[in-house]
Design a protein with these regions (language model features):
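Short, structured active-site "lid" loops
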Residues: 1-10
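A short acidic, amphipathic alpha-helical/loop segment
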Residues: 13-17
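Active-site nucleotide/adenylate-binding loops and adjacent lid/helix of ATP-dependent enzymes
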Residues: 19-22, 26, 30-115, 121-124, ...
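Protein kinase-like catalytic core scaffold
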Residues: 75, 115, 137-138, 184, ...
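Phosphate-binding site of ATP-dependent enzymes
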Residues: 89-179
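A short glycine-rich, hydrophobically flanked beta-strand micro-motif that places a catalytic Asp/Glu
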Residues: 117-118, 181-193
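C-terminal active-site "lid" helix and adjoining low-complexity regulatory extension at the edge
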Residues: 177, 190-232
Length: 232
C-alpha cells in the first residue's frame, strides 16, 4: 500500500489502521511518525550521525526565551508539525522572539512545543532529493522567491535540476535508513561551513516540480518499487 496523503495526521492514522489490518504500507508507521515531527526527526538523524542543523526545544514561554539566549540569534522557529513553510519564522533578536512566542502561547497546544534551529548560512536555495528504495532517483535546487529567505515552492520559489553526486546520494540514503523510510523526499542545505546537511525528511513527498524540471517519471518509479515489493 503506497501512502500518498500529504496530511500528517490523516496519513499517520490511516497508516496505523492499514497496518492494523495486516497491510504493508510505504512508508511504515514508525517512519511516518518520525518524519512528520521535526523534533523527532532531528533527534533520530543526529543519533544516526546525519549532518543536520543544530536545534533546541523548549516547553514553556520562559524556557523558550532562556533557550534562545543560550542558543543565540538569529534562530529559526518551526512548528514541530507543519509543511509548505507555514508558521516558520526567522527570529533576529530578543524582542521579535518574545512577540512570536507570546502569540503562540494563545494558539493550539501543539504550538507550545518550541522548536528552534540555527540559521544556516547558505546559498539562496536548498535541495529536494527523491529517494526510492536505495536510490536517489532525482534532485532539484529550490531557489527562494523574491524577498523570501524560505525556499518552499509553495511560497513562489523556482526549481532547477540538481546533479546527484555521490556525496548527495550517500547522505540521503543514510537519512532515509535512519528514519526507516522506503520512499521519501530529503531536503538539504549547502552550509557555507559544514557542507550538505539534512533539514527535513518528507514521508509523503511531493514531486510535481521535480518531474517538471528533471523529466524523471517519479510516480512511475514509486509504483514500480511498490509492485516489486508486493511480488517479493
Amino acid at each position: 500500500m503506497l501512502q500518498r496523503s500529504v496530511s500528517y495526521f490523516k496519513s499517520l492514522h490511516a497508516t496505523a489502521a492499514l497496518e492494523g489490518l495486516g497491510s504493508h504500507v510505504i512508508n511504515p508507521l514508525q517512519a511516518a511518525s518520525m518524519t512528520g515531527n521535526k523534533l523527532f526527526a532531528h533527534m533520530i538523524l543526529e543519533k544516526a550521525g546525519v549532518r543536520t542543523p543544530k536545534a533546541v526545544a523548549a516547553f514553556s514561554e520562559d524556557s523558550a526565551m532562556a533557550a534562545l539566549e543560550e542558543f543565540g540569534y538569529p534562530a529559526v522557529i518551526k512548528p514541530v508539525v507543519g509543511s509548505w513553510g507555514r508558521m516558520i519564522g526567522l527570529l533576529r533578536e530578543k524582542d521579535a522572539a518574545r512577540a512570536v512566542i507570546e502569540d503562540r502561547e494563545h494558539m493550539f497546544p501543539l504550538y507550545h512545543v518550541y522548536y528552534f534551529e540555527e540559521f544556516v548560512q547558505r546559498p539562496p536555495r536548498d535541495i529536494r532529493a527523491i529517494v526510492v528504495g536505495d536510490n536517489v532517483v532525482a534532485a532539484i535546487y529550490r531557489y527562494s522567491g523574491d524577498g523570501e529567505w524560505k525556499t518552499n515552492m509553495a511560497l513562489g520559489g523556482r526549481a532547477e535540476v540538481c546533479p546527484v553526486t555521490k556525496e548527495l546520494e550517500d547522505i540521503c540514503i543514510k537519512a532515509t535508513r535512519a528514519v526507516g523510510g522506503q520512499i521519501v523526499g530529503v531536503d538539504l542545505m549547502e552550509s557555507d561551513k559544514d557542507g550538505l546537511m539534512v533539514h527535513e525528511v518528507n514521508n509523503t513527498t511531493e514531486f510535481k516540480n521535480t518531474v517538471r524540471v528533471t523529466g524523471v517519471d517519479v510516480p512511475g518509479l514509486m509504483v514500480d518499487y511498490a509492485l516489486a515489493l508486493n511480488k517479493g
